[in-house]
């Protein structure tokens, strides 16, 4: 049976990673303009996120614009949107389930085996959430690399990895590790019932002498 310290560590890591995924989904710095060419204007920096695109001037002023049409977005951006939302929803559900199964809480009854299985279920949901976010960040990251090295892409519209992708990768790793630690709460092959010693019966004395 996993100890409560391991469960608390796993839950804390997963929750911290989930908060990172929220920040990654919200901020617009998924793609940032590249400065790889000689004719790149550095007076402004352009960013693309899941919900908006922004331009930052050299003075520090930032102006953002929401995307006009969802259908006009690239497939990678649409898929990343969906996967990140799924990851956040699953992460919230996993926190609720894991809280009921942790040893340091009184939710879920006093049955230790049952609570361990609930915590393990929460850990598995965390793992699924982390995988969804990892796929989302890797998908759009692959698209950025493909477009960057595509010779047909003009130099002035090439983008590089933004901070949001790295935050998403870090958050995914924390959620996966936290979910794995919570999954160690599995009771395994231990039986709920305690071991019962075999009963001993008195030997019958069939050769008892009769007077």
UniProtKB/Swiss-Prot annotation:
The reply to whether Membrane figures as a keyword in the UniProt entry is yes
Q: Where is this region: Interactions with TJP1, TJP2 and TJP3?
A: 210-211
Family, according to the entry, reads as follows: Belongs to the claudin family.
Record localization? Cell membrane; Basolateral cell membrane; Cell junction, Tight junction
How does the UniProt record describe the way this protein sits in the membrane? Multi-pass membrane protein
Q: Name one GO molecular function term.
A: protein domain specific binding
Its GO biological process annotations read:
bicellular tight junction assembly; calcium-independent cell-cell adhesion via plasma membrane cell-adhesion molecules; cell adhesion; negative regulation of apoptotic process; negative regulation of cell adhesion; negative regulation of protein-containing complex assembly; positive regulation of cell motility; positive regulation of cell population proliferation
What this chain does, per the entry, is described as:
Plays a major role in tight junction-specific obliteration of the intercellular space.
What organism, scientifically named, is this protein from?
A: Rattus norvegicus
**Pfam families linked:** PMP22_Claudin
Kindly list the organism's lineage: Eukaryota, Metazoa, Chordata, Craniata, Vertebrata
* Record-linked Gene3D superfamilies: 1.20.140.150
Q: Which GO terms describe its cellular component?
A: apicolateral plasma membrane; basolateral plasma membrane; bicellular tight junction; lateral plasma membrane; plasma membrane
The gene it comes from is Cldn7
Primary location class: membrane
PANTHER family annotated for this entry? CLAUDIN (PTHR12002)
Q: Fill in the PTM field for this protein.
A: Phosphorylated.
Q: Does the keyword Cell membrane apply?
A: yes
How does this chain assemble?
Directly interacts with TJP1/ZO-1, TJP2/ZO-2 and TJP3/ZO-3. The phosphorylated form interacts with EPCAM.
List all topological domains (Extracellular): 29-81, 141-160
Protein name from the UniProt record: Claudin-7
**Stretches of the chain found on the membrane's Cytoplasmic side:** 1-7, 103-119, 182-211
InterPro entries under this entry? Claudin (IPR006187), Claudin7 (IPR003552), Claudin_CS (IPR017974), PMP22/EMP/MP20/Claudin (IPR004031)
What are the transmembrane regions?
8-28, 82-102, 120-140, 161-181
Q: Which UniProt keywords apply?
A: Cell junction, Cell membrane, Membrane, Phosphoprotein, Tight junction, Transmembrane, Transmembrane helix
């Amino acid at each position: 049976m996993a100890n409560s310290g391991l469960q608390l560590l796993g839950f804390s890591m997963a929750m911290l990673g989930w908060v990172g995924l929220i920040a990654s989904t919200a901020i617009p710095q998924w793609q940032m303009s590249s400065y790889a060419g000689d004719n790149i204007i550095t007076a402004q920096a352009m960013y693309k996120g899941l919900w908006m695109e922004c331009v930052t001037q050299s003075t520090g002023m930032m102006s953002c614009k929401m995307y006009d049409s969802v259908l006009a977005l690239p497939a990678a951006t649409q898929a990343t949107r969906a996967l990140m939302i799924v990851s956040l929803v699953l992460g919230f559900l996993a926190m609720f389930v894991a809280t009921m199964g942790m040893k340091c809480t009184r939710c879920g009854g006093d049955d230790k085996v049952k609570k361990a299985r609930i915590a393990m279920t929460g850990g598995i949901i965390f793992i699924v959430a982390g995988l969804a976010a990892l796929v989302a960040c890797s998908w759009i990251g692959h698209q950025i690399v493909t477009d960057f090295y595509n010779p047909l892409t003009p130099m002035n519209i090439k983008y590089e990895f933004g901070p949001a992708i790295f935050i998403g990768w870090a958050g995914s790793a924390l959620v996966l590790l936290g979910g794995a630690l919570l999954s160690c709460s599995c009771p395994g092959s231990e039986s709920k019932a305690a071991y019962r010693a075999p009963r001993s019966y008195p030997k019958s004395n069939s050769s008892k002498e009769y007077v």
